Each structure stands twice: as structure tokens, then as C-alpha cells.
């Protein structure tokens, strides 16, 4: 009986932690220039706002940067 309560508590804790990750990123597939830490033209932000997201930024690694939108 005690192990069931512990298992339930553990699963509940994991579920709550997943809900706290509200600012998940959504890759859009739109390429963007190398941001060097700052996206100067705000291309991704405005593109994501147009699609109904809360905002976005240019993310990735050298030679492969994509716009990623914030869902919430």
C-alpha cells in the first residue's frame, strides 16, 4: 500500500514538473541569419507573432539557424 502512494506521488510530481515547463520552443522551419547572441532585425519574433505565438528567436548552431517560437 505504501509503495502505491509513493508511486502515485512520484508520477504526480513528474506531471506537475512538466506543466511548469510552459515556455517550450516550437521550431518553425524558417531559416534565420547567424544571431551571434542577438537577433538584430527581430525577423523571428515578428514572424512568430504573426503566426499567433507569444514571440520567438533565432536558435541553432553554426550554419544551421532556425526560428523557434515561444508557445506560452
UniProtKB/Swiss-Prot annotation:
Cellular component annotations (GO), alphabetically ordered: extracellular region
Coiled coil: none
Principal subcellular localisation of the protein: secreted
Keywords recorded for this protein, A-Z: Antimicrobial, Disulfide bond, Fungicide, Plant defense, Secreted, Signal
Organism superkingdom: Eukaryota
Cysteine-cysteine disulfides: 32-58, 44-67, 48-69
A GO biological-process term: defense response to fungus
Cellular localisation: Secreted
Protein name in the entry: Defensin-like protein 35
Amino acid at each position: 500500500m505504501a509503495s502505491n502512494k509513493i508511486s502515485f506521488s512520484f508520477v504526480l510530481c513528474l506531471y506537475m514538473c512538466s506543466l511548469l515547463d510552459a515556455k517550450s520552443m516550437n521550431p518553425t522551419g524558417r531559416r534565420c541569419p547567424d544571431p551571434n547572441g542577438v537577433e538584430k532585425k527581430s525577423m523571428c519574433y515578428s514572424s512568430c507573432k504573426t503566426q499567433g505565438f507569444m514571440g520567438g528567436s533565432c536558435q541553432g548552431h553554426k550554419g544551421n539557424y532556425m526560428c523557434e517560437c515561444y508557445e506560452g
